[in-house]
Amino acid sequence: MEIDLNADLGEGCGSDEALLDLVTSANIACGWHAGGAQAMRDCVRWAVEKGVSIGAHPSFHDPENFGRKEMDLPASEIYAGVLYQLGALSAFAQAEGGRIAHVKPHGALYNQAAREPEIADAVVSAIHDFDPSLAVFGLAKSGFVDAARQAGLVAVEEVFADRGYRADGSLVPRSQPGALVDDENEMLARTLEMVRGQRVRAVTGEWVPLNAQTVCLHGDGPHALAFAKRIRDALEAAGIDVHAPGALHAGERA
């Protein structure tokens, strides 16, 4: 049994360099919701040094709301924005001797792509046109991962240790009760169940089947680093191999 651990980095609110010792994939903000040129360069350099798979974390151009405000934009504008951000991060990866291996949209773009086919297609098209060898990280069971596969991309289904789920496999919106799981012991138990049992309990009590291929660990809490270590240690103690999906070791130098 195997699993990938990913974290959203370069957002200016966590211990990015230390977290890269614990995760196997890094989703690096591309400056549109957080971060910037220096943060991108630093995170890429650290990922290359530590052999962590490098991923782009594009978003809507919305730093005021940390990229979490849903937007109604033309597909062509979404396509152009994603392509722009991929190009920016790829330049830093190339300069540091690495390459981008995957793409995970951020915030509202992630959530809307999961349920709105037109947005999913725009994001997938930008990724495919930039580099069809890139993998796509998306919400498990979502239309976004289906769209990626239909376009011939590798889709990696993502689950969350600290988010509440609805019975259809979607995430409980952050504005609603049950959206966030705060208890570390519960998060740990949920993660092990998602990885070993391939299921999660919804806020309404049902078991929801999931194809857990990568687990997102949010790195912006005060205890994020310690909890990431607990998760990694628990997975390895359970005999689960923790590494980037497939051969996506983009942090390694050529």
UniProtKB/Swiss-Prot annotation:
Enzyme Commission no: 3.5.2.9
Keyword DNA damage included in the entry's annotation: no
Gene behind this protein: pxpA1
Family assignment from sequence similarity: Belongs to the LamB/PxpA family.
Keywords: ATP-binding, Hydrolase, Nucleotide-binding
GO biological process: carbohydrate metabolic process
GO molecular function per UniProt: 5-oxoprolinase (ATP-hydrolyzing) activity; ATP binding
Reactions performed catalytically: 5-oxo-L-proline + ATP + 2 H2O = L-glutamate + ADP + phosphate + H(+)
Cited InterPro entries: Glyco_hydro/deAcase_b/a-brl (IPR011330), LamB/YcsF/PxpA-like (IPR005501)
Protein name (record): 5-oxoprolinase subunit A 1
Pfam families recorded: LamB_YcsF (PF03746)
Top-tier EC class: hydrolase
Gene3D superfamilies: Glycoside hydrolase/deacetylase (3.20.20.370)
Role summary: Catalyzes the cleavage of 5-oxoproline to form L-glutamate coupled to the hydrolysis of ATP to ADP and inorganic phosphate.
Subunit architecture: Forms a complex composed of PxpA, PxpB and PxpC.
